[in-house]
């Protein structure tokens, strides 16, 4: 037992003096390995009596635990010292913020579409999509647009052939929805549309959001209330809003909606009206039982008014100096 005590004291002494992890590992092998000094003490068990063996075995195990615990503590201490020395050498200020990436922002047109979708989504309107290459039935005929209407002219519409064209409005999505779903319906249809026009306030491709509600006893007062609330929500102002009588082939009665600008002038922002009975009949909905309202707005137009942009073409020129303003 005296010999075991001396071995443990010797081990603890060399562990305390060790200055690196490799030396500590060598000490572990020297004392606790298969041929280590403490392990060899177990060979003495054979020369002991039955009464002495339990006490001796317990002493050897305690010796192993004492040496192992000291090794573990010394290893942890050396690792902590190495880390501290490394941090000092590299002179890291951990309080400094990390490097950040130059993150882009949403395009202003995308921001506007999301804002519109959020407002109408809270009122139960579902977003619907449709093809951008459209046939004349869904783009014109079903919308009560006569064969000789100016909107069908080549100078307004991009035709692939007399029956197929790039859609001039997203109203075709409303027709397709009414063909496959029965009232009550509440939908909005955002998307790209195409018209043969290009100047400071028009581009050949632009974005529209059209809305449709069809159910029993839908009336114009509901339409006015929803659009009035939308415009005040969108512009975040208690705007003065007016509805002017107008004409659209697919609605009757029809109106254009204006808001009072900061310059004291009325600004047109969207069109609307009660769905024409002929439109409902074209998709198999009984206009005697159901009524509905529809509205449409140009996304770029609303975006220009909200952010004070004067030239529509700025949205499509990808000038980072312009786009970074909307982060």
UniProtKB/Swiss-Prot annotation:
Disulfide bonds: none
Compartments in which it is found: Cytoplasm
Cofactor (UniProt): Mg(2+)
Gene field: pheS
Cellular compartments per GO CC: cytoplasm
Alphabetized GO MF terms: ATP binding; magnesium ion binding; phenylalanine-tRNA ligase activity; tRNA binding
Name of the protein described by the UniProt record: Phenylalanine--tRNA ligase alpha subunit
EC number(s) given by UniProt: 6.1.1.20
Coiled coil: none
Entry-linked SUPFAM superfamilies: Class II aaRS and biotin synthetases, tRNA-binding arm
């Amino acid at each position: 037992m005296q010999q075991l005590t001396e071995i443990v004291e010797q081990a603890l002494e060399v562990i305390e003096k060790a200055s690196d992890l490799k030396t500590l590992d060598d000490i572990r092998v020297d004392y606790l390995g298969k041929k280590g000094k403490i392990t060899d003490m177990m060979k003495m068990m054979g020369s002991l009596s039955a009464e002495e063996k339990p006490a001796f075995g317990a002493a050897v195990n305690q010796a192993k635990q004492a040496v192992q615990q000291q090794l573990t503590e010394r290893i942890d201490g050396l690792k902590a010292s190495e880390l501290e020395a490394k941090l000092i050498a590299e002179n890291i200020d951990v309080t400094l913020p990390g490097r950040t990436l130059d993150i882009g922002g949403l395009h202003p047109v995308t921001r506007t579409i999301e804002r519109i979708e959020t407002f109408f989504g809270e009122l139960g309107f579902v977003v619907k999509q449709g093809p951008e290459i459209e046939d004349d039935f869904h783009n014109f005929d079903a919308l009560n647009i006569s064969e000789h209407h100016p909107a069908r002219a080549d100078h307004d519409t991009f035709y692939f052939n007399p029956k197929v064209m790039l859609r001039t409005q997203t109203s075709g999505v409303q027709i397709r929805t009414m063909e496959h779903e029965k009232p009550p319906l509440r939908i909005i249809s955002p998307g790209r549309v195409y018209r043969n026009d290009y100047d400071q306030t028009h581009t050949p491709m632009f974005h529209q959001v059209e809305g449709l509600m069809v159910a029993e006893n839908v009336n114009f007062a509901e339409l006015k209330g929803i659009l009035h609330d939308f415009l005040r929500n969108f512009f975040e102002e208690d705007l003065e809003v007016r509805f002017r009588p107008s004409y659209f082939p697919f609605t009757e009665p029809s109106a254009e909606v204006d808001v009072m600008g900061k310059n004291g002038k009325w600004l047109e922002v969207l069109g609307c009206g009660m769905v024409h009975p002929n439109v409902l009949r074209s998709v198999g909905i009984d206009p005697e039982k159901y009524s509905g309202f529809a509205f449409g707005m140009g996304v770029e137009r609303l975006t220009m008014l909200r952010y004070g942009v004067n030239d529509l073409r700025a949205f499509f020129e990808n000038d980072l100096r312009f786009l970074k303003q909307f982060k």
